[in-house]
Amino acid sequence: MNIELRNICKNFEKQVVLQDVCFEDDINSIAIIGPSGGGKSTLLRIIGGLLLPSSGEMYIDGKQINFNEKELQIHRKNIGFVFQSKGLFEHLTAMENVMLPLIHTFGINKSEAIETANKLFSRFGLAQEKDKYPFQLSGGQQQRISIARAVAIKPELLLLDEPTSALDPEYTSEVLNMLGELQNDGLNTIIVTHEMGFAKNACEKVIFLVDNKIIESGNSAETFKSPKSEQLTSFLNKILVWKV
């Protein structure tokens, strides 16, 4: 999948959140990293069609995505979303959380929706949890079910906004292992993350976003090994100094 961003800007009233963001590359898996408040989540939501830019253009595989609601609805149906908060419906079981959107949003018949959900629960070691409600599940299980729900529609692109930031370390590993497996299957993913090990080792490419702009981007392993900008060098030194 090729994604091109041309001079994307986003302002909230007088606050500049993104300023002339330009990017073009073929992606399979890409991590967006950078300090808090740099515009990472805003950029992810614009790519997903959840938020309109103040100005700029976006192209997916050479086709311009016009920022009107009719086109954005079509665009969003090809994308799976996972956010920091797990977003499961508390009054529904895990099975219902995965199955019902397939039926009511995507028009899949009930038997096919159940079959799809069961396959995902079995694949990701969640079969024993499918009849439980969210309050009966660990944070890691809830987030993995959120990811299962997002990929149940067989999206062309999966967007994840800090999916592990609210999790304990052992649950973080569960979620990252699941994402690694999906990436190995060839699912296109863009993830906003503070997990530098995952960004370096599991994502093919990386974008470093700071002060509302993309400062650096490229191959993950090379970028982490030899950052070109002082900002990224300083950021990585601060992040990695306390790592085991």
Describe every region a protein language model picked out.
Residues 158-161:
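Catalytic Walker B motif of ABC-type/P-loop ATPase nucleotide-binding domains
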Residues 152-156:
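A short, proline-enriched helix->beta-strand linker immediately N-terminal to the Walker B motif
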